Amino acid sequence: MQDLSFEARLAELESRLAFQEITIEELNVTVTAHEMEMAKLRDHLRLLTEKLKASQPSNIASQAEETPPPHY
């Protein structure tokens, strides 16, 4: 009787381990896909930022071009 309980427990643990391995592999695939998508989005964001900076000159004058405040 003790052996059946031990065998049943062992089979249950092996089953759980198999399901955990499958779940870990699925999560790994998902994380890898998300990392690749994030890398693409970072590249797009960098390109858009560069285009925006190139297309719009800054409206803020440099400190050398600024007139001093009236209390000087």
Curated annotation (Swiss-Prot):
A UniProt-annotated Pfam family: SlyX
Region feature Disordered, mapped onto this chain: 52-72
Chain ranges passing through the membrane: none
InterPro entries named among the record's database cross-references: SlyX (IPR007236)
Lineage start: Bacteria, Pseudomonadati, Pseudomonadota, Gammaproteobacteria, Enterobacterales
Family according to the record: Belongs to the SlyX family.
Protein's name in the database: Protein SlyX
PANTHER family: PROTEIN SLYX (PTHR36508:SF1)
Bias (Polar residues) ranges: 55-65
Protein's organism: Escherichia coli O17:K52:H18 (strain UMN026 / ExPEC)
